[in-house]
Each structure stands twice: as structure tokens, then as C-alpha cells.
Amino acid sequence: MEIPRRHFLHLAGGAAAAAAFSNLAAALDYPNRPVRFVVAFFAGSLSDILARSIAPSLSKRLGQEVIVDDQPGAGGNLATDIVVRASSDGYTLLEATSANVWNAALYDGLNFDFIRDIAPVASISRTPAVLTVTT
């Protein structure tokens, strides 16, 4: 049986609208549980301090607890891998640094493609790097 083009377009449009609105309905409930904020460096590092300074205001704004989770190692690759493997539901955030971008060139066999698998949400700081000498 052949479906007329016009009828097919109406069905396709209806299906697309239903899919879009089902995602919207799910998004209206976000967040309904704590959010995990993964940091790729040790406790006390600049990245950790930044995450811990942002977490309270982010928690207040979202109306849910934001848990800072330090996962240091392999230049940020361990933390990135944890986030990439998590559900893409917005409940697992990664504090990314320039190291994350460089890692693709530095390490062979990563289980992820940082550009493809991670989506930027917001810029949270700009930290200059300074070359110094003793005086």
C-alpha cells in the first residue's frame, strides 16, 4: 500500500512534534536529583577550588544539590571518560580545561573523542598561563 505524499508529511510532522514535546516534558522536570560535577584534578587544585566556588550558586539556581567529584589522573582523561560513559541526561558535568583538548594529540587509543562526545555548556573562567623566573 502506498501512502500519499501529503498524508506521509502530516504523519511525519506529527511524529516529530510528539518526539519534540516528549523531550520538553522530560526537560521540565530537570533536575529532579543531584547533579554530579566531575573535576579532572586533585582536591585543592585550581580546578577543584573553582568547581567548589561555583557549586553552591549552581545548586541554588537548579534547586538541586551539585556534588563536586574529583577524579584526577591521566591528564584529565579519567574524568572525561567517566563523563562520556555517563547518561547524556545533563546530570553529569565535566569541568574541562585546555588539557582536554590537547589530550587527543598526546594520547593514543582514547575511548572518546572530546570534540564529538562532549558539548560545551558555559565558560566559567579564563586563567592565564604566565612564564616566570626567580628574582
Give, region by region, the residue ranges found by the protein language model.
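N-terminal (or domain-start) structured segment
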Residues: 10-13, 26-117
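N-terminal secretory signal peptides and thylakoid transit peptides that target proteins
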Residues: 1-15
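N-terminal signal peptide c-region/cleavage motif recognized by signal peptidases
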Residues: 20-22
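Short Pro/Gly-enriched coil loops immediately N-terminal to beta-strands
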Residues: 114-116, 121-128
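Hydrophobic/proline-rich hinge and linker segments of small-molecule sensing/allosteric domains
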Residues: 105, 125-135
